[in-house]
Amino acid sequence: MQISISPTKLEVAQIFSEYLEEQIKSNKTTHIALSGGSTPKVVFDYMAEHYKDVDWSTVHLYWGDERCVPPADSESNYKMTVEHLLSKINIPKDNIHRVHGEDLPELEAERYGKVLEEELPIVNNIPQFDIVILGMGDDGHTASIFPHEIDLWDSKNNCEVAVHPDSGQRRITITGKLINNAKTVAFLVTGSSKAEKVRTIITKEEGHDSYPASLVVPSSGDLIWFLDEEAAAQIN
């Protein structure tokens, strides 16, 4: 596990963007699972402005989770990515593999799981992303696996339907076996509200394993936390 700490959210975006460009340049093809949330939004803005010259034709984009809403809905992770990145770079449409949030959730979870099997290399009998980008909620959730549904992590399926604990909103999420089979997993976590969970999970305090984010242990050993100083305030 590596930990990168930057003074601000913008500098987290800068450091991660530099890292991502290096990965894209070093691979013939790069399969990336994207995350929603405020920190990826800043990353997308930064990359759209500073990394237009990346050869995006070698990059295939997927989503680690998506809300069960149409693609034009303001809640859609896909819509956010289009507005902040995809509309501003030259990437082939065939390289964008969105979750169909408008479709029946159970059927879409099954369909998207098959898409991943068709598009990604199969390693250890599991589809393998080059990079999975994850956020972490104040409650310790990651992707769309929440503490009250932590058993979804161990699903035999590639994708599952999750339910937000407060709103009841349904979401499609990749499961633990895909996350931990990735070549690299990168957490993007910023803000003081995350500091307690960051400390609990990274230092493996008692009870840490009740948070889905603590279950991110890629078999490759390549796990990187990109934090700002606020999120890292409670770790040494």
Q: Residue ranges of each PLM-predicted region?
A:
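A glycine- and small-aliphatic-rich helix-loop capping segment at beta-alpha/alpha-beta transitions
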Residues: 46-55, 147-155, 204
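ATP/nucleoside-binding phosphotransfer catalytic cores, i.e., glycine-rich phosphate-binding loops
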Residues: 177, 183-236
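Class I SAM-dependent methyltransferase SAM-binding "motif I" and its flanking Rossmann-like core
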Residues: 134-177
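Glycine-rich beta-strand-to-loop/alpha-helix junction loops that act as flexible
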Residues: 34-39, 134-138, 190
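N-terminal glycine-/serine-/threonine-rich phosphate-binding loop
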Residues: 1-32, 106
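Ligand-binding beta-strand-loop-alpha-helix segment within the catalytic cores
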Residues: 56-130
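A short secondary-structure junction signal
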Residues: 109-110, 143-148, 197-201
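Glycine-rich N-terminal segment of FAD-binding domains in flavoprotein oxidoreductases
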Residues: 28-50
